[in-house]
């Protein structure tokens, strides 16, 4: 069956079983039984308890739970308590973030206007929007939110702002004409859509779709069917957890086999293996990563980027494609006059001279033949008309004053058939009719032209020159209005017959201009290896003109329309997207397909936008970025990040922050794993050598959860560097555990383990196993605290300013050193931590071994740096 916009008014009324008189209450009830309420439905929500328990599905967390169970069976209550506390805190943090993430459909409901004027039982009544049904006749006027989708049956110069649905900033002129061809949403001029606004005129429409069947409802369905994406960090950490668990099993198996082979009891050998497992798993890793990302969100919030989904902090730093909406994102979402063409000259608005009679006439007439107002900063009316009022205001002209000086005495409102608007005024003692409209249409009716030398007959050469200028404006993406006038007789009532014998005055060209910061932000993206792509519901020429201004597009061949990709297969689209930088006249479904096509090519995609039409693609993208000021609630709630200043440049800063945070998280992971590897190495060496276990399980948990956690968090707050923006985006499939990264962890862990083992042997030979264990415990704690400074850079930093540029790391070191020194020297701690009291000389020996590990690792970095320079 044909779409409603391709059917006549009578065919539509028959199809929805209605008439121009509307429905009766009985008919409305019957229709509601078939179609339901005019509201958006939701999928089943997860309870907070479900969300909370989902946090325990993390692979590392499951390993920790298993370790806690084994420790409990073996009677190690302290280990169980510490592990349970850590994973519970992590689950609470994850739940708080997730609970905020699924509110898109609630925001979409807000677009169903609270009330509407409807014809019911033969009279006009005001009803809640949710009670409207298919077949109802709704009455529309300027300022109304349209409550449902409908086919127009009456039209009086109706204009509708559909930017939230289509992305096009200009109000759409509506008509009653039946369309024969299949056209995009933005070109269905005989239809009105739920969630859009009437900006001008009046009309009547018969409702054709309500609730989930409206265009807004279809978007709600897309939101429900679009799955959440994992960020690269989530993928990498999951991969890391699996690899780590394999290593742990291998190490534990080796240790258990060695112990049994040496004749130890299976129970004690198993306990020994559990101690190694506890040492191998960085218990605080999940919570530390979450805390570092949380600190990152606070920093980004201060820089106008609100993070709604925690892992988006890192994910944004790895994007390689930014698919950006045009209207309100790259542009100001505000029509602005760019140029005048008057007396044969093109004049940029920056060069306007109101002492010039022609320019002053054109400005005055653009105010008089204009229905918009701007009082106390509140704009009412069509965006193109408010642009004319705003320009006058910028030049010190008050529209109200000019209108009072030359009051309107008659008018012929704009309609899409005539493509013009006329007003009558008393000017200089004469009745003057001002006519504005489409250039081609007005030139047909023009007989004279205003020049500085006076009014003369317009020639064919004049018309060609005007048409060429109009074409030039259009190719630059500018919307053009022509202004003409004529004298009419006294006490004259305007009619369409008067719209001829006109005198041409000039052209005014306007556009929704780019934001001032967009060009620089796009250039910064390209420098960082990120490709910006414009996706918009606007016209191709307009979109391409904006894209060329800001550096997204170089040639018109890089632009296409939604119709061009409509019939492409997914495989064809995947090959097509690298060639295109601008997509115009696209639907929400097109946006999702474009995002998916880039994702299938292995790209990490960010999608920016502010309208309802952007919401599904925002959710499909790896990172959805919504505008906070001009953005709809739907877009904000579907996004992972919201920009509070609507500044495209904020995205670039967010990318920089994301890259730096990922780097800092790598520092923290490097710190934790190399330290843990040192502990494993010490345990294995002792086992192979037939020596006592150098650590008690409580030692290892103390190190992992106290002296490790604070430095790791501090490394996550390492000062940011702008140098990361000189690098290309990180590959989506690149693991965080590269060979080079693992090599550094292994080498640094070896040094820490070696110093720990030497310290253990020193204490062991001094006074037996307990003192040896105390030496090993103290050295490992302090060596890992010193190691925080090693992890700040791949280069040696010990004799540079960078060694001291992180006050958080310095604080963590001092606090950790005080804690471990207290444990080693205060007798009350000895029974709990299973250590022996150290005297000053013994304590100095422990510190010396720990500091030696710092010096050795710094020396190895210096050697590596010099080797690479060669």
Tell me the role of every PLM-derived stretch.
Residues 687-696, 760-772:
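Helix-coil boundary and interhelical linker segments in multi-pass alpha-helical membrane proteins
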Residues 370, 602, 655, 659, ...:
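Alpha-helix capping/termination and helix-coil
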Residues 731-750, 770-774:
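Membrane-water interface at loop-to-transmembrane-helix junctions
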Residues 1-726, 736-737, 750, 777, ...:
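Conserved cytosolic headpiece of P-type ATPases
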Residues 707, 752, 774-788:
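Generic alpha-helical transmembrane segments
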